[in-house]
Amino acid sequence: MKRSTVVIRPSARALSRQASSQSFLLARSSALTSRQRRLYSTHPPNARLNLPIDYATTPLLAHTSQAALSNPELPASVRNGTTKRMNLFQAINDALSTALAEDESVLIFGEDVAFGGVFRCTTKLAETYGGDRVFNTPLTEQGIMGFAIGAAAEGMRPVAEIQFADYVFPAFDQLVNEAAKFRYRDGAGGRSAGGLTVRMPCGGVGHGALYHSQSPEALFTHIPGLKVIIPRGPVQAKGLLLAAIRSNDPCVVMEPKILYRAAVEQVPTTAYELPLGKAEILKEGKDVTVVSYGQPLYKCMAALKAAEQDFGVSVELIDLRTIYPWDKETVFNSVRKTGRCVVVHEAMVNAGVGAEVAAAIQEDPETFVRLEAPVARIAGWSIPTPLVFEQFNLPDVTSKCYLTLGLADVYADGMPRDIRRHQKGDEFLRDLSMNSGILKQSMLHSSRRGVDWLMGIVLDDIILSVFLV
Amino acid sequence: MFSRAVRLSRAALPIRVASQRVPIAARRSVTTNAAQAQVDKSTIPESEDEPFTIRLSDESFETYELDPPPYTLEVTKKQLKQMYYDMVVVRQMEMAADRLYKEKKIRGFCHLSVGQEAVAVGVEHAIEKTDDVITSYRCHGFAYMRGGTVRSIIGELLGRREGIAYGKGGSMHMFTKGFYGGNGIVGAQVPVGAGLAFAQKYTGGKKATVILYGDGASNQGQVFEAFNMAKLWNLPALFGCENNKYGMGTSAARSSALTDYYKRGQYIPGLKVNGMDVLAVKAAVQYGKQWTVEGNGPLVLEYVTYRYGGHSMSDPGTTYRTREEIQRMRSTNDPIAGLKQRIINWGVATEEEVKGIDKAARAHVNEEVAAAEAMAPPEPTAKILFEDIYVKGTEPRYIRGRTLDEVYYFN
């Protein structure tokens, strides 16, 4: 391994072509320098599209008090109140504090929560509400969950924290076989574990490797009897978490850990709930529906902005918020309007939320007949989370997807923008044979554009909106 | 049950060396002093390889339904020096990791074992290469002692291809021959260790598995499930709780109903060991291995140790314990200083020679760390991202997070 750079190796043929052009080599050398610095899968240098998310300006967060209070889902009393700037963990802390204050039966426990928790979500709660209501548990996930279920069955409202979603698996049996089935099996007895809320941080964090970056939400969506909730920011986190705590169903609240400090917005100071099982349309559009939840929403927003600007398409963005049971009506209505749908999540693609949404869309006759393209999924690959290559796995702004039948196209970061939908769409559809293999077509096309495909590396410089032909 | 344990441990007392410092009636506990072993200096041979007998402190062990190991240990000068060298290398390696982390060259989660070196080193000096070791996420020292090189361990932390796990695992997930990790899930390695022990028993040979977990992990249900299987099938398993007093930020007493972790096996005999004294660890594990491979079934050991640093790199380690406590352990119970003192006092090596060992260990680590830092960062290719997961040919044909200017293209 003498090679000093991280470049993708060009073929011999490509090299000889390069050698023939001195100016070309010179032009590459400056890029090499930037490559050398990129030891981790951080944001690409010189990227036009895959830029770091600017949480300070994203329209997905309420940056002003006015924006936060204009939310029509909030009751009038809240909208007439005040707001405070909070990040995600502070909003969660606020919700937990509210729940503890308003209801004696609310308990909070988990590993290290009395010290504030590893992500600071429970800061000062033990001091304020006492060690008998906010307390540390041993490192015993299965025990924590069973304990919480027992407490909930007696009418308490336990909020159990699993320190990382990756640690929840020992507790899986308790969630699946006890919490979710409690009401069903008790029947007329009327007991349930409905007061149970489980919180856990999930998702990529940049370098979590095998056991600190997973997104196991789809596993819980397979269990009737649980509600699975993923907030995208502080306002949501507070409202959804309070709703979950007050809800009489066992709820799993998964918090994208990368947003704990990154996502900051104005949050109403008074207590409020946001509806569970209800999606939110973040942006209306007419050509394609993008369905997502949690952190990838920010990337979707960046992608659709680029798509709208570059291709003149109009994209609708839906935040599922509750991923089980999810809001089919909102999604179906949107897809009936646009005819196209992309589902985006970090968790691996197989048997994920995307699969469920896609299947439901095609099962619904009224929505199916309106489809103009297969429902696409952009999700993590079917791999364990890599250590240094996390960004190479997570969906990004330019993730490839095939929205139209058989059409694959390449839109490269920094390449001339000549594949505009309105100019070429119909031509491409005619050119590409439906059954010749999407990838092959895209490769042919890319080769024409001079991308080096010989190493079998296809860059992810393919923007989803290209396919909205 | 516990009264029986107390009775047994009293009954075992006469076996111990004559000098009892603690009244029998008083509740005794294992010392964490690292320099209490003694030797009759006249018995120390000239030769490096000739064994001589040292006498361990009578506070080195506590037992539960088990006769204590002999309070004597045969060692050679060479072994003592090697143990010292190994502990210094492990500590230097951890310090290097600390530095690289603070320089932001190592990212992610990283747990250091500074202060706990005597356990990894003592265990390895008591077992054979054919035995197995499996441990928790605080695994750098074990990976080194099992045969991993410093460069491959630091390379792993840096995410390099030449790292011990191809740069894919990082701090918590290291594997080498006879070493099954490194596991990021608290307690998950314990039943896996029982399976390793079963395979050893099944395939025959006098082999054992050393299974380590922390005081925090000892409350995981699967630890008890593993205990039961190991005893039921009489497996050659040496369960070992590395009790460093804190599971993350929660002290043992706040998380555990019974902090005598060596008694946690209930129906499995237990042995509590001074985990700051590498010689006591060696003596205990040596004894435990012999005991278990003779068909006596599993053993639950407890290594009483201490970590100087925080739980991980993001924990300063001072919010849940006093600085004085850390300072006291460092200054009076340090495993490396303890062994050093004895080596010099016993005349096994002169102060100059010990300094030479220090220097050699430091130079070795520096050289290896430099080599690790010089390793090329992994190529961001699909091959690396998808290898060992997808059947060849079925991989996704592209990776994410790249831009066009990061490839060569022609035309």
From Swiss-Prot, chain A:
Catalytic activity: N(6)-[(R)-lipoyl]-L-lysyl-[protein] + 3-methyl-2-oxobutanoate + H(+) = N(6)-[(R)-S(8)-2-methylpropanoyldihydrolipoyl]-L-lysyl-[protein] + CO2
Needed co-factor(s): thiamine diphosphate
Biological processes per GO annotation: branched-chain amino acid catabolic process; response to nutrient
Chief localization: mitochondrion
SUPFAM superfamilies associated with the record: Thiamin diphosphate-binding fold (THDP-binding), TK C-terminal domain-like
Residues that bind K(+): G194, L196, T197
Gene Ontology terms for molecular function: 3-methyl-2-oxobutanoate dehydrogenase (2-methylpropanoyl-transferring) activity; metal ion binding
EC number: 1.2.4.4
Gene3D superfamilies: 3.40.50.920, 3.40.50.970
SMART domains (alphabetical): Transket_pyr
Keyword terms of this UniProt record: Metal-binding, Mitochondrion, Oxidoreductase, Potassium, Transit peptide
InterPro entries: THDP-binding, Transketo_C/PFOR_II, Transketolase-like_Pyr-bd, Transketolase_C
Presequence boundaries: 1-40
Compartment(s) of residence: Mitochondrion matrix
GO cellular component, one term: mitochondrial matrix
Spans traversing the lipid bilayer: none
Function: The branched-chain alpha-keto dehydrogenase complex catalyzes the overall conversion of alpha-keto acids to acyl-CoA and CO(2). It contains multiple copies of three enzymatic components: branched-chain alpha-keto acid decarboxylase (E1), lipoamide acyltransferase (E2) and lipoamide dehydrogenase (E3).
Subunit structure: Heterotetramer of 2 alpha and 2 beta chains.
Name used for this protein in its record: 2-oxoisovalerate dehydrogenase subunit beta, mitochondrial
Organism: Chaetomium thermophilum (strain DSM 1495 / CBS 144.50 / IMI 039719) (Thermochaetoides thermophila)
Curated annotation (Swiss-Prot), chain B:
UniProt keyword Metal-binding, yes or no: yes
Residues involved in pyruvate binding: H111, Y137, R138, G184, V186, D215, G216, A217, N244, Y246
Keywords assigned by UniProt, alphabetized: Magnesium, Metal-binding, Mitochondrion, Oxidoreductase, Pyruvate, Thiamine pyrophosphate, Transit peptide
Keyword Lyase among UniProt keywords: no
E.C. number: 1.2.4.1
Cofactor(s) of this protein: thiamine diphosphate; Mg(2+)
Cellular component GO terms held in the UniProt record: mitochondrion
Coiled coil: none
UniProt protein name: Pyruvate dehydrogenase E1 component subunit alpha, mitochondrial
Lineage of the species this protein comes from: Eukaryota, Fungi, Dikarya, Ascomycota, Pezizomycotina
